[in-house]
Amino acid sequence: MSITLSDTAAARVNAFLANRGKGFGLRLGVRTSGCSGMAYVLEFVDAPQPEDTVFEDKGVKVVVDGKSLQFLNGTQLDFVKEGLNEGFKFTNPNVKDECGCGESFNV
């Protein structure tokens, strides 16, 4: 099982955590949403829960809850700039289909 980050994503998460002034790491999860069924959730976490799995890559701790882990195993998190837009991009080998707008996915 693994979750990895690009150098750019790791630098961005570390910058956000430094600005925040505290935090254990980044929580990555999924929730029911959108036309394809699931959407990614990113939030800062101050402490993992007992049922969480913690991955560390490039100095960043990524916390994943047990239910989300089956859908996120092998995912790489990147941070990209496309024109005027910038944000996190997920490369998830478990995704079978995505909605046209790219906001949700199906596994």
UniProtKB/Swiss-Prot annotation:
Coiled-coil features, chain-numbered ranges: none
InterPro entries: Fe-S_cluster_asmbl/transfer, FeS_biogenesis, FeS_cluster_insertion, FeS_cluster_insertion_CS, HesB-like_dom_sf, IscA_proteobacteria
GO cellular component, one term: cytosol
Cofactor section: Fe cation
Pfam family for this entry, one: Fe-S_biosyn
Residues reported to bind Fe cation: C35, C99, C101
GO biological process, one term: iron-sulfur cluster assembly
Keyword Cell inner membrane found: no
Molecular-function GO term, any one: 2 iron, 2 sulfur cluster binding
Record keywords, A-Z: Iron, Metal-binding
The keyword Ribosomal protein is assigned to this record: no
Note describing how the cofactor binds: Binds 2 iron ions per dimer. The dimer may bind additional iron ions.
Function: Is able to transfer iron-sulfur clusters to apo-ferredoxin. Multiple cycles of [2Fe2S] cluster formation and transfer are observed, suggesting that IscA acts catalytically. Recruits intracellular free iron so as to provide iron for the assembly of transient iron-sulfur cluster in IscU in the presence of IscS, L-cysteine and the thioredoxin reductase system TrxA/TrxB.
PANTHER family hit by this protein: IRON-SULFUR CLUSTER ASSEMBLY 1 HOMOLOG, MITOCHONDRIAL (PTHR10072:SF41), IRON-SULFUR CLUSTER ASSEMBLY PROTEIN (PTHR10072)
Family (UniProt): Belongs to the HesB/IscA family.
Assembly behavior: Homodimer; may form tetramers and higher multimers.
HAMAP family per the UniProt record, alphabetical: Fe_S_insert_IscA
The name this protein goes by in its record: Iron-binding protein IscA
Organism of origin: Cronobacter sakazakii (strain ATCC BAA-894) (Enterobacter sakazakii)
Gene: iscA
